[in-house]
Protein backbone atom coordinates (compact mmCIF):
# COMPACT_ATOMS: atom_id res chain seq x y z
CA UNK A 1 0.00 0.00 0.00
CA UNK A 2 1.32 3.44 -0.96
CA UNK A 3 2.64 5.47 2.04
CA UNK A 4 0.24 8.35 1.25
CA UNK A 5 -2.72 5.97 1.36
CA UNK A 6 -1.50 4.47 4.62
CA UNK A 7 -1.11 7.94 6.16
CA UNK A 8 -4.58 8.94 4.99
CA UNK A 9 -6.16 5.82 6.51
CA UNK A 10 -4.32 6.49 9.77
CA UNK A 11 -5.72 10.04 9.82
CA UNK A 12 -9.23 8.73 9.14
CA UNK A 13 -8.84 6.24 11.98
CA UNK A 14 -7.88 9.05 14.37
CA UNK A 15 -10.92 11.10 13.33
CA UNK A 16 -13.27 8.13 13.64
CA UNK A 17 -11.90 7.25 17.09
CA UNK A 18 -12.66 10.81 18.18
CA UNK A 19 -16.21 10.46 16.84
CA UNK A 20 -16.65 7.14 18.66
CA UNK A 21 -15.36 8.72 21.86
CA UNK A 22 -17.66 11.75 21.65
CA UNK A 23 -20.67 9.56 20.87
CA UNK A 24 -19.65 7.14 23.65
CA UNK A 25 -20.62 4.04 21.67
CA UNK A 26 -20.94 1.80 24.73
CA UNK A 27 -23.25 4.31 26.43
CA UNK A 28 -25.21 4.55 23.17
CA UNK A 29 -25.72 0.76 23.17
CA UNK A 30 -26.85 0.90 26.81
CA UNK A 31 -29.29 3.69 25.94
CA UNK A 32 -30.72 1.65 23.06
CA UNK A 33 -31.28 -1.33 25.39
CA UNK A 34 -33.10 0.95 27.82
CA UNK A 35 -35.30 2.48 25.11
CA UNK A 36 -36.09 -0.96 23.65
CA UNK A 37 -37.22 -2.05 27.11
CA UNK A 38 -39.48 1.01 27.36
CA UNK A 39 -40.84 0.47 23.84
CA UNK A 40 -41.79 -3.11 24.72
CA UNK A 41 -43.95 -1.93 27.64
CA UNK A 42 -47.61 -2.52 26.61
CA UNK A 43 -48.67 0.51 28.66
CA UNK A 44 -46.33 2.87 26.83
CA UNK A 45 -49.01 4.07 24.40
CA UNK A 46 -51.29 5.17 27.21
CA UNK A 47 -49.34 8.41 26.89
CA UNK A 48 -49.04 8.90 23.13
CA UNK A 49 -46.80 11.97 23.28
CA UNK A 50 -44.29 10.17 25.53
CA UNK A 51 -44.54 7.03 23.38
CA UNK A 52 -43.69 9.01 20.25
CA UNK A 53 -40.69 10.56 22.00
CA UNK A 54 -39.45 7.10 23.07
CA UNK A 55 -39.85 5.54 19.62
CA UNK A 56 -38.27 8.57 17.94
CA UNK A 57 -35.28 8.51 20.30
CA UNK A 58 -34.92 4.76 19.79
CA UNK A 59 -35.01 5.06 16.01
CA UNK A 60 -32.48 7.91 16.04
CA UNK A 61 -30.11 6.13 18.47
CA UNK A 62 -30.23 2.90 16.45
CA UNK A 63 -29.50 4.80 13.22
CA UNK A 64 -26.60 6.66 14.85
CA UNK A 65 -25.06 3.43 16.17
CA UNK A 66 -25.56 1.74 12.81
CA UNK A 67 -23.83 4.62 10.99
CA UNK A 68 -20.76 4.66 13.22
CA UNK A 69 -20.47 0.83 13.15
CA UNK A 70 -20.70 0.85 9.34
CA UNK A 71 -17.97 3.50 9.14
CA UNK A 72 -15.71 1.43 11.41
CA UNK A 73 -16.30 -1.70 9.30
CA UNK A 74 -15.57 0.16 6.06
CA UNK A 75 -12.39 1.67 7.46
CA UNK A 76 -11.15 -1.64 8.87
CA UNK A 77 -11.76 -3.25 5.46
CA UNK A 78 -9.72 -0.65 3.54
CA UNK A 79 -6.25 -2.28 3.93
CA UNK A 80 -7.61 -5.59 2.62
CA UNK A 81 -9.37 -3.76 -0.22
CA UNK A 82 -6.09 -2.14 -1.29
CA UNK A 83 -4.19 -5.41 -0.96
CA UNK A 84 -6.63 -7.13 -3.32
CA UNK A 85 -6.68 -4.11 -5.66
CA UNK A 86 -2.90 -4.13 -6.06
CA UNK A 87 -3.13 -7.71 -7.33
CA UNK A 88 -5.91 -6.84 -9.79
CA UNK A 89 -4.49 -3.70 -11.39
CA UNK A 90 -5.10 0.01 -11.98
CA UNK A 91 -8.91 -0.13 -12.30
CA UNK A 92 -9.28 -1.91 -8.96
CA UNK A 93 -6.93 0.60 -7.30
CA UNK A 94 -9.04 3.45 -8.73
CA UNK A 95 -12.15 1.83 -7.21
CA UNK A 96 -10.38 1.52 -3.85
CA UNK A 97 -9.38 5.20 -4.04
CA UNK A 98 -13.00 6.16 -4.77
CA UNK A 99 -14.18 4.19 -1.73
CA UNK A 100 -11.53 5.87 0.44
CA UNK A 101 -12.62 9.35 -0.70
CA UNK A 102 -16.28 8.46 -0.10
CA UNK A 103 -15.39 7.13 3.36
CA UNK A 104 -13.54 10.36 4.18
CA UNK A 105 -16.64 12.41 3.30
CA UNK A 106 -18.91 10.16 5.38
CA UNK A 107 -16.60 10.30 8.42
CA UNK A 108 -16.40 14.10 8.08
CA UNK A 109 -20.20 14.30 8.01
CA UNK A 110 -20.40 12.13 11.12
CA UNK A 111 -17.78 14.31 12.80
CA UNK A 112 -19.95 17.37 12.14
CA UNK A 113 -22.87 15.65 13.89
CA UNK A 114 -20.77 15.45 17.07
CA UNK A 115 -20.50 19.25 17.00
CA UNK A 116 -24.25 19.60 17.52
CA UNK A 117 -24.22 19.67 21.30
CA UNK A 118 -26.27 22.80 21.99
CA UNK A 119 -29.21 22.73 24.39
CA UNK A 120 -31.79 22.54 21.60
CA UNK A 121 -29.71 21.08 18.75
CA UNK A 122 -31.48 17.70 18.84
CA UNK A 123 -34.88 19.30 18.21
CA UNK A 124 -36.99 19.57 15.09
CA UNK A 125 -36.55 22.89 13.29
CA UNK A 126 -39.16 25.58 12.73
CA UNK A 127 -38.19 27.61 9.66
CA UNK A 128 -39.58 31.07 8.88
CA UNK A 129 -38.81 32.71 5.53
CA UNK A 130 -39.73 36.34 4.76
CA UNK A 131 -39.23 38.21 1.50
CA UNK A 132 -37.25 41.43 1.81
CA UNK A 133 -36.24 44.24 -0.52
CA UNK A 134 -36.72 43.57 -4.21
CA UNK A 135 -40.46 43.58 -4.89
CA UNK A 136 -41.85 40.65 -6.85
CA UNK A 137 -38.34 39.26 -7.35
CA UNK A 138 -37.88 39.11 -3.58
CA UNK A 139 -41.19 37.26 -3.18
CA UNK A 140 -40.11 34.80 -5.88
CA UNK A 141 -36.73 34.46 -4.16
CA UNK A 142 -38.40 33.65 -0.83
CA UNK A 143 -40.35 30.85 -2.53
CA UNK A 144 -37.15 29.53 -4.15
CA UNK A 145 -35.50 29.39 -0.72
CA UNK A 146 -38.45 27.53 0.75
CA UNK A 147 -38.22 24.98 -2.06
CA UNK A 148 -34.46 24.64 -1.47
CA UNK A 149 -34.95 23.68 2.19
CA UNK A 150 -37.89 21.38 1.45
CA UNK A 151 -35.86 19.60 -1.25
CA UNK A 152 -32.94 19.24 1.17
CA UNK A 153 -35.25 17.65 3.73
CA UNK A 154 -36.82 15.34 1.15
CA UNK A 155 -33.42 14.14 -0.07
CA UNK A 156 -32.56 13.13 3.49
CA UNK A 157 -35.92 11.48 4.11
CA UNK A 158 -36.98 14.09 6.67
CA UNK A 159 -40.58 15.07 7.27
CA UNK A 160 -41.81 18.57 6.42
CA UNK A 161 -45.00 20.15 7.76
CA UNK A 162 -46.06 23.51 6.31
CA UNK A 163 -47.92 25.67 8.83
CA UNK A 164 -48.47 28.84 6.85
CA UNK A 165 -47.80 30.31 3.41
CA UNK A 166 -48.60 33.94 2.65
CA UNK A 167 -48.64 34.32 -1.13
CA UNK A 168 -47.64 37.52 -2.92
CA UNK A 169 -50.05 38.95 -5.48
CA UNK A 170 -47.99 38.55 -8.66
CA UNK A 171 -45.65 35.65 -7.85
CA UNK A 172 -43.82 34.03 -4.98
CA UNK A 173 -44.53 34.35 -1.27
CA UNK A 174 -44.42 37.11 1.31
CA UNK A 175 -43.60 34.59 4.04
CA UNK A 176 -43.78 30.92 4.97
CA UNK A 177 -43.48 28.86 8.13
CA UNK A 178 -42.74 25.14 8.13
CA UNK A 179 -41.25 22.47 10.37
CA UNK A 180 -38.47 20.07 9.42
CA UNK A 181 -38.99 16.92 11.46
CA UNK A 182 -35.78 15.01 12.08
CA UNK A 183 -33.29 14.64 14.93
CA UNK A 184 -30.79 17.51 14.97
CA UNK A 185 -32.58 19.42 12.22
CA UNK A 186 -32.58 22.55 14.40
CA UNK A 187 -28.88 22.28 15.22
CA UNK A 188 -28.13 21.73 11.54
CA UNK A 189 -30.37 24.37 9.98
CA UNK A 190 -29.76 27.05 12.61
CA UNK A 191 -26.58 28.03 10.74
CA UNK A 192 -28.87 29.18 7.91
CA UNK A 193 -30.23 32.10 9.94
CA UNK A 194 -29.69 35.48 8.32
CA UNK A 195 -30.19 37.36 5.07
CA UNK A 196 -29.84 35.49 1.78
CA UNK A 197 -29.08 37.59 -1.32
CA UNK A 198 -29.92 36.68 -4.93
CA UNK A 199 -28.48 38.36 -8.03
CA UNK A 200 -29.97 37.41 -11.40
CA UNK A 201 -31.63 38.67 -14.57
CA UNK A 202 -35.18 39.33 -13.43
CA UNK A 203 -37.79 37.12 -15.16
CA UNK A 204 -40.32 39.84 -14.27
CA UNK A 205 -38.47 42.72 -15.98
CA UNK A 206 -39.41 43.25 -19.65
CA UNK A 207 -36.04 44.90 -20.26
CA UNK A 208 -34.12 41.93 -18.83
CA UNK A 209 -32.24 43.93 -16.24
CA UNK A 210 -30.24 42.48 -13.40
CA UNK A 211 -32.05 42.47 -10.06
CA UNK A 212 -30.79 42.00 -6.50
CA UNK A 213 -33.28 40.48 -4.07
CA UNK A 214 -33.19 39.66 -0.38
CA UNK A 215 -34.96 37.19 1.91
CA UNK A 216 -34.63 36.57 5.62
CA UNK A 217 -34.38 33.07 7.11
CA UNK A 218 -35.18 32.43 10.76
CA UNK A 219 -34.73 28.99 12.36
CA UNK A 220 -36.19 28.13 15.77
CA UNK A 221 -36.26 24.93 17.84
CA UNK A 222 -39.67 23.31 18.14
CA UNK A 223 -40.94 23.74 21.69
CA UNK A 224 -41.41 20.69 23.91
CA UNK A 225 -43.41 20.37 27.13
CA UNK A 226 -40.20 20.42 29.17
CA UNK A 227 -39.52 24.02 28.05
CA UNK A 228 -42.36 25.35 30.23
CA UNK A 229 -43.29 28.11 27.80
CA UNK A 230 -46.68 28.97 29.26
CA UNK A 231 -48.87 31.37 27.30
CA UNK A 232 -51.60 33.23 29.19
CA UNK A 233 -54.78 33.07 27.09
CA UNK A 234 -55.60 36.64 28.14
CA UNK A 235 -52.36 37.79 26.48
CA UNK A 236 -53.33 36.38 23.08
CA UNK A 237 -55.80 37.88 20.61
CA UNK A 238 -57.26 35.30 18.23
CA UNK A 239 -58.52 36.35 14.78
CA UNK A 240 -59.98 33.97 12.21
CA UNK A 241 -60.34 34.47 8.46
CA UNK A 242 -60.55 32.52 5.21
CA UNK A 243 -57.44 30.86 3.86
CA UNK A 244 -56.04 32.41 0.69
CA UNK A 245 -53.87 31.10 -2.11
CA UNK A 246 -51.76 32.67 -4.88
CA UNK A 247 -53.10 36.03 -6.02
CA UNK A 248 -55.19 36.39 -2.88
CA UNK A 249 -57.90 33.99 -4.03
CA UNK A 250 -59.85 32.23 -1.29
CA UNK A 251 -59.17 28.51 -1.00
CA UNK A 252 -61.65 27.76 1.78
CA UNK A 253 -65.32 28.54 2.29
CA UNK A 254 -65.01 28.71 6.08
CA UNK A 255 -62.99 30.90 8.44
CA UNK A 256 -60.37 28.21 9.08
CA UNK A 257 -57.22 30.38 9.04
CA UNK A 258 -56.01 31.64 12.42
CA UNK A 259 -53.97 34.68 13.42
CA UNK A 260 -52.56 34.89 16.96
CA UNK A 261 -51.27 38.18 18.36
CA UNK A 262 -49.25 38.01 21.56
CA UNK A 263 -50.12 41.38 23.09
CA UNK A 264 -47.15 41.80 25.51
CA UNK A 265 -44.51 41.23 22.79
CA UNK A 266 -46.42 42.16 19.63
CA UNK A 267 -45.51 38.82 18.02
CA UNK A 268 -48.00 37.84 15.30
CA UNK A 269 -48.35 34.26 14.05
CA UNK A 270 -50.65 32.97 11.31
CA UNK A 271 -51.54 29.46 10.22
CA UNK A 272 -53.84 28.51 7.36
CA UNK A 273 -52.54 25.27 5.86
CA UNK A 274 -54.66 22.90 7.97
CA UNK A 275 -58.28 22.26 6.99
CA UNK A 276 -59.84 23.04 10.36
CA UNK A 277 -59.70 26.14 12.53
CA UNK A 278 -58.80 24.02 15.58
CA UNK A 279 -55.83 22.40 13.82
CA UNK A 280 -54.61 25.79 12.63
CA UNK A 281 -54.92 27.22 16.13
CA UNK A 282 -52.88 24.35 17.60
CA UNK A 283 -50.18 24.79 14.94
CA UNK A 284 -50.15 28.58 15.38
CA UNK A 285 -49.77 28.19 19.15
CA UNK A 286 -46.82 25.85 18.56
CA UNK A 287 -45.13 28.51 16.42
CA UNK A 288 -45.92 31.25 18.95
CA UNK A 289 -44.35 29.19 21.74
CA UNK A 290 -41.21 28.70 19.63
CA UNK A 291 -40.98 32.45 19.04
CA UNK A 292 -41.46 33.18 22.75
CA UNK A 293 -38.73 30.67 23.56
CA UNK A 294 -36.44 32.52 21.15
CA UNK A 295 -37.28 35.83 22.88
CA UNK A 296 -36.27 34.23 26.18
CA UNK A 297 -33.03 32.89 24.68
CA UNK A 298 -32.16 36.28 23.16
CA UNK A 299 -32.62 37.93 26.55
CA UNK A 300 -30.30 35.35 28.12
CA UNK A 301 -27.71 35.82 25.36
CA UNK A 302 -27.87 39.62 25.78
CA UNK A 303 -27.16 39.21 29.49
CA UNK A 304 -24.18 36.95 28.75
CA UNK A 305 -22.86 39.37 26.10
CA UNK A 306 -23.13 42.24 28.59
CA UNK A 307 -21.16 40.22 31.13
CA UNK A 308 -18.52 39.35 28.53
CA UNK A 309 -18.40 42.95 27.32
CA UNK A 310 -18.92 42.24 23.62
CA UNK A 311 -21.62 43.12 21.14
CA UNK A 312 -22.92 39.63 20.50
CA UNK A 313 -23.38 37.93 17.15
CA UNK A 314 -24.45 39.46 13.84
CA UNK A 315 -26.76 36.74 12.52
CA UNK A 316 -29.09 39.34 11.02
CA UNK A 317 -26.47 40.41 8.46
CA UNK A 318 -26.04 39.00 4.97
CA UNK A 319 -24.72 35.47 5.28
CA UNK A 320 -24.87 34.04 1.76
CA UNK A 321 -24.88 35.34 -1.78
CA UNK A 322 -26.40 33.46 -4.73
CA UNK A 323 -25.23 34.90 -8.05
CA UNK A 324 -26.86 33.62 -11.26
CA UNK A 325 -25.65 36.50 -13.48
CA UNK A 326 -23.16 37.62 -14.78
CA UNK A 327 -21.43 34.50 -13.40
CA UNK A 328 -22.60 31.43 -11.48
CA UNK A 329 -21.64 31.15 -7.81
CA UNK A 330 -23.08 30.60 -4.35
CA UNK A 331 -20.81 31.87 -1.58
CA UNK A 332 -21.16 31.86 2.20
CA UNK A 333 -19.87 35.19 3.44
CA UNK A 334 -18.92 33.85 6.90
CA UNK A 335 -17.10 30.65 6.01
CA UNK A 336 -15.92 31.56 2.47
CA UNK A 337 -17.30 28.19 1.32
CA UNK A 338 -18.48 28.46 -2.29
CA UNK A 339 -19.72 26.36 -5.20
CA UNK A 340 -20.15 27.12 -8.89
CA UNK A 341 -23.40 25.20 -9.37
CA UNK A 342 -26.32 27.33 -8.11
CA UNK A 343 -28.88 25.02 -9.74
CA UNK A 344 -27.79 22.10 -7.54
CA UNK A 345 -27.78 24.31 -4.43
CA UNK A 346 -31.27 25.63 -5.13
CA UNK A 347 -32.40 22.03 -5.62
CA UNK A 348 -31.41 21.25 -2.03
CA UNK A 349 -27.72 20.34 -2.32
CA UNK A 350 -26.66 22.42 0.69
CA UNK A 351 -24.85 19.88 2.89
CA UNK A 352 -21.48 21.48 2.16
CA UNK A 353 -22.76 24.86 3.35
CA UNK A 354 -24.33 23.32 6.44
CA UNK A 355 -21.18 21.41 7.41
CA UNK A 356 -18.89 24.40 6.88
CA UNK A 357 -21.35 26.58 8.81
CA UNK A 358 -21.42 24.20 11.77
CA UNK A 359 -17.60 24.04 11.86
CA UNK A 360 -17.44 27.85 11.63
CA UNK A 361 -19.92 28.25 14.49
CA UNK A 362 -17.92 25.86 16.67
CA UNK A 363 -14.72 27.85 16.05
CA UNK A 364 -16.54 31.10 16.83
CA UNK A 365 -17.93 29.68 20.08
CA UNK A 366 -14.50 28.41 21.12
CA UNK A 367 -12.94 31.80 20.40
CA UNK A 368 -15.56 33.76 22.39
Swiss-Prot record:
List locations, semicolon-separated: Cytoplasm
The record ties this protein, via Pfam families, to: PCRF, RF-1
Return the GO cellular component terms, semicolon-separated.
cytoplasm
Residues bearing PTM N5-methylglutamine: 249
> What molecular functions are annotated in GO for this chain?
translation release factor activity, codon specific
Recite the UniProt keywords alphabetically: Cytoplasm, Methylation, Protein biosynthesis
Q: In its keyword annotation, does this UniProt entry include Metal-binding?
A: no
Q: Which domain of life is it from?
A: Bacteria
**PTM remark:** Methylated by PrmC. Methylation increases the termination efficiency of RF2.
Membership in a protein family? Belongs to the prokaryotic/mitochondrial release factor family.
This one is known as: Peptide chain release factor 2
Q: What is the organism of origin for this protein? A: Rhodococcus jostii (strain RHA1)
Q: Gene of origin? A: prfB
Amino acid sequence: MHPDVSADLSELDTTLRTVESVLDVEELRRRIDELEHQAADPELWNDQEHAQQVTSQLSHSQAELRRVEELRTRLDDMPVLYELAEDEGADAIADADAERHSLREDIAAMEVKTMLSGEYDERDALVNIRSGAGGVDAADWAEMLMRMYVRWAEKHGYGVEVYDTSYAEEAGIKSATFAVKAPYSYGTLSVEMGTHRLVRISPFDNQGRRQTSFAEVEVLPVVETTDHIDVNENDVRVDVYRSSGPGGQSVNTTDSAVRLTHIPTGIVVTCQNEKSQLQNKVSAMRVLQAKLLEVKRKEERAEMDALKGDGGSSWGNQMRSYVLHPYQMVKDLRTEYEVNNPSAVLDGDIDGFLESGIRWRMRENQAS
